[in-house]
Design a protein with these regions (language model features):
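Accessory substrate-recognition/RNA-binding modules or partner subunits associated with SAM-dependent
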Residues: 2-137
């Protein structure tokens, strides 16, 4: 079972929770700006296609505590990115945070991008291209 986060406009979280529940989502947790939930890939697709309230569905790949940008790099580098998308696909890393203790989210974004590219280079021998306007993977 996968973990997801459905983003919605503020004030609609409770309605989104009920909508996701009606689609079959489990372990729902309402928070500011969205709803955490669990389910299979079919549910993820249904939520993306049928939700009238969610603006985006995010898939949790990993989660851990951190103290520095290096901790985030190490967590991102542990993921087997070639299992998630092909090196021929273009990518973009987007970082958002609330009350982040780190100095620069732009630097965090670069470190995550570096970790993904370094993992591809180590496992596949090449890295994906970066496309900031219209990437295949974000």
């Amino acid at each position: 079972m996968n973990k997801y986060f459905a983003i919605c406009p503020r004030g609609l979280e409770e309605l989104l929770t009920e909508e996701l529940r009606s689609l079959g989502a489990q372990y729902l947790k309402t928070t500011h700006g969205g709803v955490h939930f669990s389910g299979d890939w079919t549910l993820c697709y249904r939520a993306n296609l049928e939700s009238r309230l969610a603006t985006r569905i995010l898939w949790f790949i990993a989660q851990a505590g951190y103290r520095s940008e290096d901790d985030i790099y190490k967590l991102a580098a542990k993921q087997n990115w070639p299992d998630h998308f092909d090196v021929s696909r273009t990518m973009r890393v987007v970082t958002t945070a609330i009350k982040c203790p780190l100095k620069s989210l732009d630097f965090v974004t670069l470190r995550v991008k570096d970790a993904v590219c370094d993992t591809f280079r180590a496992k596949v021998g090449e890295r994906p291209n970066i496309e900031t306007r219209n990437p295949n993977v974000r």
